[in-house]
């Protein structure tokens, strides 16, 4: 899962949106640096990542990547799940329009920015102003996201080419998303993530 899905599942679980978004920028035990609700959000994010990586649908989808891109498949798939969530938001969350959800999430996350790592603050400068969460629905933007990550981390250069794997298996990936994401939403609503 990437930013949008983590925020959405956190909302459904009544968890800290701030902690769920911050988690990738925190190493080790967060309890000494953040309030308990943010800490719980960080741990929820970590549980979701482990659970998602082990879902049969996700393991199957990783196998569809070519040898040269399989190493980055988990990252590429995380971004792709956000694409499907953004694209189908009106079906998934008909009572909370995406634009309103993004404004709500931004307000929640803004409360922790003064005490956050600089890299997280930098991400937030772009995430909200450039409307990444809304733009995830556009596959051209997904390609830009993958290229941007490859530019920032040369060891992940294969992300550029992983776009072709997404394109080649688009319909099958979308089908897998519909298999697992509603289950995750139900688990979040039961606070079982």
UniProtKB/Swiss-Prot annotation:
Belongs to the AcpH family. Keywords: Fatty acid biosynthesis, Fatty acid metabolism, Hydrolase, Lipid biosynthesis, Lipid metabolism. It comes from Salmonella dublin (strain CT_02021853). NCBIfam families: PRK10045.1 (NF007466). This is Acyl carrier protein phosphodiesterase. One of its GO terms (molecular function) is [acyl-carrier-protein] phosphodiesterase activity. It catalyses: holo-[ACP] + H2O = apo-[ACP] + (R)-4'-phosphopantetheine + H(+). Converts holo-ACP to apo-ACP by hydrolytic cleavage of the phosphopantetheine prosthetic group from ACP. It comes from the Bacteria. Its EC number is 3.1.4.14. It is an enzyme of class 3 (hydrolase). Pfam families: ACP_PD. GO terms for biological process: fatty acid biosynthetic process.
């Amino acid at each position: 899962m990437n930013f949008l899905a983590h925020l959405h599942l956190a909302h459904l679980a009544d968890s800290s949106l701030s902690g769920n978004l911050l988690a990738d920028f925190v190493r080790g035990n967060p309890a000494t640096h953040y309030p308990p609700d943010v800490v719980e959000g960080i741990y929820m994010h970590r549980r979701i990542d482990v659970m998602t990586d082990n879902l049969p649908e996700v393991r199957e989808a990783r196998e569809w990547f070519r040898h040269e891109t399989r190493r980055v498949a988990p990252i590429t798939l995380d971004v792709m799940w956000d694409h499907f969530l953004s694209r189908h938001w009106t079906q998934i969350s008909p009572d909370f329009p995406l634009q309103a959800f993004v404004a709500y999430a931004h307000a929640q996350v803004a409360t922790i920015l003064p005490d956050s790592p600089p890299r997280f603050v930098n991400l937030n400068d772009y995430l909200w102003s450039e409307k990444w969460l809304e733009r995830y629905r556009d596959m051209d933007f997904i390609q830009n996201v993958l290229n941007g990550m490859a530019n920032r981390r040369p060891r992940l250069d294969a992300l550029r080419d992983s776009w072709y794997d997404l394109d080649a298996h688009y319909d099958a990936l979308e089908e897998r998303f519909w298999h697992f994401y509603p289950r995750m939403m139900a688990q979040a609503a039961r606070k079982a993530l």
